[in-house]
Amino acid sequence: MRRIAVVGAAGRMGKTLIEAVQQAPGAGLTAAIDRPDSTLVGADAGELAALGRIGVPLSGDLAKVADEFDVLIDFTHPSVTLKNLAFCRKAGKAMIIGTTGFSAEEKQRLVEAGKDIPIVFAANFSIGVNLCLKLLDTAARVLGDEVDIEITEAHHRHKVDAPSGTALRMGEVVASALGRDLEKVAVYGREGQTGARDCQTIGFATIRAGDVVGDHTVLFAADGERVEITHKASSRMTFAKGAVRAAMWLDGKAPGLYDMQDVLGLH
């Protein structure tokens, strides 16, 4: 059995991950971790996820459950994830990282850790989104410089980073296919007298409202026609199942920094 730990286990995504782990053949939740000051520490992780008792108590200290798992799934916050990364690197534990909002410098720390442990890091673990990334690469190469490119995304009111990591990843894929540097061509929102659109730019627009799980659209607009590639998530379970799939795939893999394109064989 693949022994899986979930950090941030008392949160919305954490509970969904617990459910996904317990549903996956060959996988089992053997550790669940949350903040040390959480009033839920000691509670049964299965009961937190409305699955019934599974005999795995919620811990407030990753080090105390280090012997209980093979791979850690982390969808938390950059500062938390980096602390967990340092621990897992030292302990020789594999990691699945779905946290977004890392700076370029912080991402480099993931690259360095990948020299010692196997890691799957992705802005989005949905199989559909990763298929969209493949389609976006093809669309950008075919349509080339003949189109204006805009990326729109919508998420629930609680999401703290913008644009979403998925939207940025989509932008990176498109920019790379066109030989552009996203940092130089990205335009984040528009206001006032912006002037005519620079055809080399890639625009981003963000919506935060209600309980939207995650909508992403990339628009390729030319004179006379438009191509839109859209993905809409209706449940967090799609991300959780992808993360568990990645955790199973990582079993026996050499140290390295992988992504969902590797997991799905899309490279």
UniProtKB/Swiss-Prot annotation:
Keywords, alphabetical: Amino-acid biosynthesis, Cytoplasm, Diaminopimelate biosynthesis, Lysine biosynthesis, NAD, NADP, Oxidoreductase
Catalytic activity: (S)-2,3,4,5-tetrahydrodipicolinate + NAD(+) + H2O = (2S,4S)-4-hydroxy-2,3,4,5-tetrahydrodipicolinate + NADH + H(+); (S)-2,3,4,5-tetrahydrodipicolinate + NADP(+) + H2O = (2S,4S)-4-hydroxy-2,3,4,5-tetrahydrodipicolinate + NADPH + H(+)
UniProt cross-references to Pfam families, sorted A to Z: DapB_C, DapB_N
Pathway(s) this gene product operates in, as recorded in its UniProt entry: Amino-acid biosynthesis; L-lysine biosynthesis via DAP pathway; (S)-tetrahydrodipicolinate from L-aspartate: step 4/4
Active site per database record: 155 (proton donor/acceptor), 159 (proton donor)
Binding site for NAD(+): 8-13, 34, 98-100, 122-125
Assigned GO CC terms: cytosol
EC number, as in UniProt: 1.17.1.8
Disulfide bonds: none
Ligand binding (NADP(+)): 35
Binding site for (S)-2,3,4,5-tetrahydrodipicolinate: 156, 165-166
PANTHER family: 4-HYDROXY-TETRAHYDRODIPICOLINATE REDUCTASE 1, CHLOROPLASTIC-RELATED, DIHYDRODIPICOLINATE REDUCTASE
Family stated for the protein in its record: Belongs to the DapB family.
Xref: NCBIfam families: dapB
The name this protein goes by in its record: 4-hydroxy-tetrahydrodipicolinate reductase
